[in-house]
Amino acid sequence: MSQPIQYLDVSENIPCSRCKTETAILISRKEKFCKDCFVRFIRGKQRKQMQDEKYKVKYGKNEENSPVQKVLLTLSCGVSSLVLVDVMTSLLKEQFDMHKGKQGFELVLLNINEYELKALDRSVKDVLEQLVQRFKPINITYKILSLESYVLDQSLLEKIVLNGDFTAYSQSIHHDRDYTLSEVLDLCPNKSSLEDLLTIIYDELILRTACLESCETILYGHSMTRIANEIIALTVKGRGSSIYQTVSDHSVNFRNKDYKIIFPLRDVLFAEILAYSKLSELDTFAVESTKPVSKITKNMTIRDLTTNYFNQLDATGYASTASTVVKTGDKLGAPKFEEDSSICQVCGTEIHQDPKEWLRRITVNKAAPLETEEEKEYAEQYKKASSLIEEPSSTQSKTPINICYGCTVTISGIKNESGFIWPIKYPANDEEREILNEYILTDDEDDQ
């Protein structure tokens, strides 16, 4: 099997299959490309995903009646998101040149500060300033957001417990001090639980930012390989009902307003992303984690394992498997049930079928009778270690909450005397309970 990208020897002067004049430098999808044609090919994938009139320059009545769109681009300063920034600014540059300084939309870059979390090799703020200079005269604004801003209202924090039949309850905690997000995440027993909770945090912060910045469109730089990775990871984590939102463009309702989520690079393999980055000299802007990556399987997160799987497929010439996975996932629509759905009060996802009923059917809840003193001693040790698993009789002064299967799995793995503390979502009075005026976004926040 051939590699997804094959670089050619330019001394052989093999003509480009597209323009027929320039020398081809690589082969992708069995086609020979010169540098300019390959860059144009990748940019064309983004244009295909964003053909809506609202992203085009408007004149006359259309300009008066339709304000300029604001588009939020999530930027981690990884290779994929950097390529997406380059692709989007190339579109804006074309509009700027063809329409005498006009742009069809305003681009807002959002970076969620991971400097300490991932031990990044440099400040993202410095990179963002360099990017703004690189793409002048295109007007780009950027925001750097702290992870700690996820917990704005301490009164929303409550302790969550699960009893033996998988019913979840929330319990008020003493607010004699403020809890930081770092303290909450420190309760995670493993990297997979931490990864799952961080995904919930990122999604929420991105939607909050889109709301406050009046951005109606949100762009993710996920490649086809990344989307295939997410499909497998979501399946393993028990979040299969969310796959349809990960695979294709869709709308999300947040605070009674719809936001369009678009994956402009969903038709591009990660190997092609790397080639584009190399040819466009974007590698110098990439920010990487300095944390050593574990090679021991048990120390890897679910996403680490699925990423390694697709990396091996790329290395062995089976990169097209990602396309098959995405096409299969693309056939999955939103779950359809006649019963009324509810909202998970941990992650906010829609619950179409109560996971408790299914878990009770497949789980043996009653243990065999304890016969020896040793067995009784082990049972007591287990009860002390499993502080989040409580018996139904101890549910007084606790409020039942709705929780999805994925969050049930994540929370049940957390064992700590303080329990699992998390900001509970209350859909009925969400806007009243959250403190929007304390949510501060700046484009000059210190990244460290």
Swiss-Prot record:
Metabolic or biological pathway, per its Swiss-Prot or TrEMBL entry: tRNA modification; 5-methoxycarbonylmethyl-2-thiouridine-tRNA biosynthesis
Keyword set, alphabetical order: Cytoplasm, tRNA processing
InterPro entries noted in UniProt: CTU2, Rossmann-like_a/b/a_fold
Pfam family, one: CTU2
Disulfide bridge map: none
Biological processes per GO annotation: invasive growth in response to glucose limitation; protein urmylation; pseudohyphal growth; tRNA thio-modification; tRNA wobble position uridine thiolation; tRNA wobble uridine modification
Cell compartments where the protein resides: Cytoplasm
Major localization listed first in the record, in broad terms: cytoplasm
Gene Ontology cellular-component terms listed: cytosol
GO MF annotations, alphabetized: nucleotidyltransferase activity; sulfurtransferase activity; tRNA binding
Cited function: Plays a central role in 2-thiolation of mcm(5)S(2)U at tRNA wobble positions of tRNA(Lys), tRNA(Glu) and tRNA(Gln). May act by forming a heterodimer with NCS6 that ligates sulfur from thiocarboxylated URM1 onto the uridine of tRNAs at wobble position. Prior mcm(5) tRNA modification by the elongator complex is required for 2-thiolation. May also be involved in protein urmylation.
Family note: Belongs to the CTU2/NCS2 family.
Descriptive protein name: Cytoplasmic tRNA 2-thiolation protein 2
Organism: Debaryomyces hansenii (strain ATCC 36239 / CBS 767 / BCRC 21394 / JCM 1990 / NBRC 0083 / IGC 2968) (Yeast)
Gene of this entry: NCS2
